[in-house]
Amino acid sequence: MKNRLTIGLLLAAIYLFWLLLSAPARLLALTLSDDARLAQTSGTLWQGEAHQASWRGVELAYLRWEFGFSTWLPGWHIRFNDPSGLRGQAWLHGLNEFVVREGRLVIPARLISQRLALGMPLEARGQLALTLPEASFNANGCRRIAASAVQWQDAALSSPAGLLELAQVNGKLSCTPAGALAVALTQDSHQLSLTGQGVLTPDGRYTFNGTLQPRQAAPALLTLLVAQNGRKDEQGRIPWRWQGEWLSEEKK
């Protein structure tokens, strides 16, 4: 009797383990927050893909995931390569407070400019490359970011005021005590010098505070517009403040 019970429990455990391993990928959608969505899924919880995914209004195609280990920690390795040019990969660990490791993200600059309430026709060129060795987030937003780097490569801005050619824009990400995402930027080209810090809150509001300094090679109309924005300091820099709300797909 005892042997039969042991065998029965063993078979039940094997069956449950098999059910867990073969759990369909669509169950993953049940664990996501309200601002995230997966559709047209295939595979399992442990290795699969979604042909449609979105997070806070950002749409992705062909999101793939695979369970594994990074630095001896269990987690999911995700990667995506959207037709828009947005692509990236990272390791995700944890549930309530998740940790991002070995994150790399490439974003066409035009995608970001389309999400900002600029108030004037402005086309951003180039691409942003983000490296995120380690970061942690929870329901309240950003908790910690270590040794990050942001680079705007082949940077340029096209507007009715003229074409503004930028040097490579360098930045560093951090978290504010309130859980917002902050980025410190520097850029110095033959047309414009720019320094400042931007903040993006969990509810999608952003602000940027910094200084601008047009160079001699800057378009004349742009120099005039910048000069009207404020008074120069003793080094010729003009204060610049910019704020707005990150536009969802519906508001674009």
Curated annotation (Swiss-Prot):
Bilayer-spanning residue ranges: 5-25
Keyword list, A-Z: Cell inner membrane, Cell membrane, Membrane, Protein transport, Transmembrane, Transmembrane helix, Transport
Signal sequence residues: none
Ranges per topology, Periplasmic: 26-252
Chief localisation class: membrane
Location(s) in or outside the cell: Cell inner membrane
Keyword Transferase recorded: no
GO annotation, biological process: protein secretion by the type II secretion system
GO cellular component, one term: type II protein secretion system complex
Membrane side Cytoplasmic: residue ranges: 1-4
InterPro entries, A to Z: T2SS_GspN_CS (IPR000645), T2SS_protein-GspN (IPR022792)
Domain of life from the UniProt record: Bacteria
Function of the protein: Involved in a type II secretion system (T2SS, formerly general secretion pathway, GSP) for the export of proteins. Required for the translocation of pullulanase.
Family: Belongs to the GSP N family.
Name this protein carries in UniProt: Type II secretion system protein N
Species of the source: Klebsiella pneumoniae
Lineage: Bacteria, Pseudomonadati, Pseudomonadota, Gammaproteobacteria, Enterobacterales
The gene coding this protein: pulN
